């Protein structure tokens, strides 16, 4: 959206050329955001990606309204033997209604992103937490069903870091695994919110270890009944912590 129509051709060439150079193996994923697959610019973007021998490791797809869009893109990438991962932005009423199908339609998908700005415009509501709570919840439910990440919309006020932090805390509590940013100075705060604390990590280790030793469907830890479905989240926490430690991302 930030590229003027007359500049999209040049931007496309420069973006594709960037990935001709081997990217650093630093644990940070480089994602190329393309145009909507239902627009000519988006089709041109996909064509350029299919024609290159060094595609981006991941693509961000905006304004996705149906699983058919992603299934077609997946097929084209597979035909070219491109291993691009996909990050899907849900920001329309149609996309929200089909979020479950979209999230589960391709093994390439790593995350659903909530596009709150466009969504609020479609819903004719304020771009605030309460009016968009239902839409956010749908994104989390769809992502969870597919076992992928749910990423909340960026906080647009760069001069209100505390407001961003509080919104990020709410998003985490709702089930989001991260939050987008529009400026590097927002990243440390978001990392602070979404990085598992040492206390959370130790609890996850204790729960997983206890279950593995007990070989049963439920255990009692510190007087609380913990059932087996909780294990998935505990293993996710440990996987996140391990990746952060391995790549020194904080």
Sequence positions of predicted segments:
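Expand to "…catalyze enediolate/carbanion chemistry for C-C bond making/breaking, isomerization
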Residues: 1-250
């Amino acid at each position: 959206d930030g590229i003027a129509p007359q500049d999209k051709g040049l931007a496309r060439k420069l973006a594709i050329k960037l990935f001709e150079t081997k990217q650093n193996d630093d644990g940070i994923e480089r994602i190329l955001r393309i145009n909507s697959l239902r627009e000519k610019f988006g089709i041109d973007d996909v064509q350029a990606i299919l024609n290159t021998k060094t595609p981006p490791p991941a693509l961000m797809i905006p304004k996705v309204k149906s699983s058919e869009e992603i299934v077609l893109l997946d097929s084209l990438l597979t035909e070219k033997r491109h291993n691009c991962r996909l990050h899907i932005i849900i920001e329309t009423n149609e996309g929200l209604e089909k979020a479950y199908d979209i999230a589960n339609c391709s093994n390439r998908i790593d995350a659903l992103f909530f596009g709150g700005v466009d969504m609020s415009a479609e819903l004719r509501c304020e771009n605030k937490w309460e009016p968009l709570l239902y839409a956010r919840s749908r994104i989390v439910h769809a992502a969870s069903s597919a076992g992928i990440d749910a990423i909340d919309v960026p906080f647009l006020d760069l001069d209100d870091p505390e407001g961003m932090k509080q919104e990020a805390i709410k998003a985490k509590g709702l089930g989001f695994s991260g939050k987008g940013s529009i400026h590097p100075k927002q990243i440390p705060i978001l990392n602070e919110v979404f990085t598992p604390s040492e206390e959370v990590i130790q609890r996850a280790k204790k729960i997983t270890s206890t279950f593995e030793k007990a070989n049963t469907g439920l255990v009692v830890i510190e007087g609380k009944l913990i059932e087996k479905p909780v294990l998935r989240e505990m293993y996710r926490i440990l996987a996140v912590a391990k990746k952060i430690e391995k790549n020194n991302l904080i």
